[in-house]
Amino acid sequence: MQTWSSVAVPRVPGTSRPLRLYDTATGQIRPTAPGRVAKMYVCGITPYDATHLGHAATYLAFDLVHRLWLDAGHEVHYVQNVTDIDDPLLERAERDSEDWVVLGLRETALFREDMEALRVLPPRDFVGAVESIPEVVEMIEKLLASGAAYRVDDPEYPDVYFDRSFTGRFGYESNYDDETMRAIFPERGGDPDRPGKRDPLDALLWRVERPGEPAWDSSLGRGRPGWHIECSAIALKHLGIGFDVQGGGSDLVFPHHEFSAAHAEAMTGEHPFARHYVHAGMIGLDGEKMSKSKGNLVFVSRLRADDVDPSAIRLALFAGHYRDDREWTDELLKQANSRLARWREAVSLPSGPDAEATVDRLRDHLADDLDTPKALAAVDAWVDEALRHRSGTVGSESAPALVRAAVDSLLGVVL
């Protein structure tokens, strides 16, 4: 798939900081410590509707990871998938009497436009599930050969499932107990009541063709892949086992990321799938999680159509910590617009307070598990001082330009 256009990222004087992130698997904030090439996989959209602010918050969080690694001098290999074949996409297409391929292409194109408008640095590899079916099939064949996968005893639909007990490590990523897993599994695409499964929590790898559903020829028979195996196959192909960060929303902790890791580890015999499992909180509206199923959505494209500045959207979402569930409100956007106006006024002055310490604090806070509230407060403090002394010469003539470059480079906000 074609990715979106990138933007120039200014070089900022001073010393970068090693990035530390909260790892869901260990429950600790730990250094990411990548090599020369930092490797990140972030789960992408299922393209049956437009990009909402819950999506935006997730991709903006990992955009900060990307930017901080660049600031530290790393080359970044970022991979993102598109789940362009899945039940929700097929269900929406049927509801609207639309071809599922056309629907997926249109919404993927809109997603690219939204990401470009928000100045999210693009992935090097933007990969659809459909184009990855050969890799998925090869992986499932290996899992079957090793005993990690099995076919259900169903003469009509002998689907292939993953045996979750195979690795002996299942559950390490989410740290959920069986009771919690069993409660969540059916809510997030699982089929615990499928006859013939060894365990209700075993995950689908290959769905044999059903009447009226899209299917592909393969050595497994005509069918289509399960959700979790798609990300396993794409990540292994482009990044290999043991990459630095597996990212996504907190609703992907289980079953998606747990099974993606288990599939890859079962096939390779190596552990871990990723060195950090990092999850962004949910964005709510009117007291409920913003989601397509609930229909309580604020779309990025609608905000853009209403001439909302993308930098204000970034600042509004950065006002809360990325791991926290938080509310989107009109007041939040109003405050972000006010903050953006003040910042722009301050950096337009001919001089300002010395800014090196401000840039240091900005780096410190962002490197500490992406603490954007403190990072924004550090810039606010410099802006307040600059505006207090706007009528006279204060500090340095180069300070406004330094703050502008740092805010652009590290926060992706244009001043």
Swiss-Prot record:
Keyword Nuclease found: no
UniProt motif ('HIGH' region) ranges: 45-55
GO molecular function (one): zinc ion binding
Residues engaged in binding L-cysteinyl-5'-AMP: C43, G44, I45, T46, T58, N81, V82, T83, W227, G249, S250, D251, I283
Keyword Metal-binding: yes
Record keywords: ATP-binding, Ligase, Metal-binding, Nucleotide-binding, Zinc
GO BP annotation list: cysteinyl-tRNA aminoacylation; mycothiol biosynthetic process
CDD domains tied to this protein: Anticodon_Ia_Cys_like, CysRS_core
Top-level lineage group: Bacteria
Motif ('KMSKS' region): 289-293
GO CC aspect terms: cytosol
Disulfide bonds listed in the record: none
CC cofactor: Zn(2+)
Entry's transmembrane regions: none
Coiled-coil ranges from the UniProt annotation: none
Role description: Catalyzes the ATP-dependent condensation of GlcN-Ins and L-cysteine to form L-Cys-GlcN-Ins.
Family to which this protein belongs: Belongs to the class-I aminoacyl-tRNA synthetase family. MshC subfamily.
Protein name as it appears in the record: L-cysteine:1D-myo-inositol 2-amino-2-deoxy-alpha-D-glucopyranoside ligase
Species of the source: Saccharomonospora viridis (strain ATCC 15386 / DSM 43017 / JCM 3036 / CCUG 5913 / NBRC 12207 / NCIMB 9602 / P101)
